[in-house]
Curated annotation (Swiss-Prot):
Coiled coil: none annotated. Residues 1-26 form the signal peptide. It is found in: Cell outer membrane. This is Outer-membrane lipoprotein LolB. It is a lipid-anchor. GO terms for biological process: lipoprotein localization to outer membrane; protein transport. Belongs to the LolB family. Transmembrane segments: none annotated. Plays a critical role in the incorporation of lipoproteins in the outer membrane after they are released by the LolA protein. Monomer. It comes from Francisella tularensis subsp. novicida (strain U112). A lipid is attached at residue 27 (S-diacylglycerol cysteine). A lipid is attached at residue 27 (N-palmitoyl cysteine).
Length: 210
């Protein structure tokens, strides 16, 4: 076989491989259908709350910024929630490699890229010990959907769409912006700011999968 035919065959193989990689990447980043919410759209507050409360399973992907004790860090994240089970993967410029926090109502574990795994009764204790900061996972499964934890005292403000713009609950002050309609039913935020004491979390949600 001539060199020209070999080169042509190699190029064809590389082209097929490239197409497969692009296809797989597209599948990996596919998100649930989203549409913009106009300023004229006004949601029924009670209906919206109950729809979001019933939403028990999702995946959110994006970037989180952490400010604590005059330090600042950031990371990419993938957050999965399925009922009471959750998984938060953090990776990127954290300075500690990638980590995954998994848990349910009974226990929480933290695994790092070195293969080390630690367990505790709650995520706050584990994250403070290992990272120096924490994500309030018990409340986050509600707050990331822009709803309050049921049956716990809270104060809130609504925007012109009748969606949460501010929420204070469990000692946290939370603000929301840039909502989008996911799956033609769920108005979900793309930017969240959470503050308590000397800790501030800035969460950008780039995609929702439900």
């Amino acid at each position: 076989m001539s060199k020209l035919k070999i080169d042509t065959k190699r190029r064809f193989s590389l082209l097929i491989a490239l197409v497969l990689i692009i296809s797989l990447s597209s599948c990996a980043t596919t998100q649930t259908n989203v549409t913009a919410i106009t300023t004229k759209t006004v949601f029924n507050q009670e209906t919206t709350y109950h729809n979001l409360l019933k939403l028990k399973k999702w995946q959110a992907n994006g970037v989180i910024g952490i400010i604590y004790d005059n330090q600042a860090e950031s990371a990419n994240y993938t957050y999965l929630q399925d009922g009471d089970n959750f998984s938060i993967k953090l990776y990127g410029p954290l300075g500690i490699g990638s980590i995954e926090i998994k848990g349910d109502t009974n226990s929480v574990s933290l695994a790092n890229s070195k293969g080390q795994k630690l367990t505790a009764k709650d995520a706050k204790t584990l994250m403070l010990e290992q990272l120096g900061w924490y994500v309030p996972v018990e409340g986050l499964k509600y707050w990331i959907k822009a709803i309050a934890i049921p049956n716990i005292r809270q104060t809130s403000e609504l925007n012109t769409n009748n969606l949460l713009s501010k929420l204070s609950q469990n000692g946290w002050s939370i603000s929301y912006s840039n909502y989008q309609l996911v799956d033609s039913k769920y108005p979900l935020p793309t930017k969240i700011r959470m503050s308590r004491d000397n800790l501030t979390l800035k969460i950008v949600i780039k995609s929702w999968q439900i």
